[in-house]
Amino acid sequence: TNDSAGDGTTTASVLAR
């Protein structure tokens, strides 16, 4: 995932997995 901004989208994507 791309979350260079640290906006939490990566965390959401991981939880969605």
Swiss-Prot record:
The keyword Chaperone applies. It is found in: Plastid, Chloroplast. Its main location: plastid. This protein shows ATPase activity. Belongs to the chaperonin (HSP60) family. Oligomer of probably six alpha and six beta subunits. This protein binds RuBisCO small and large subunits and is implicated in the assembly of the enzyme oligomer. This is RuBisCO large subunit-binding protein subunit alpha, chloroplastic.
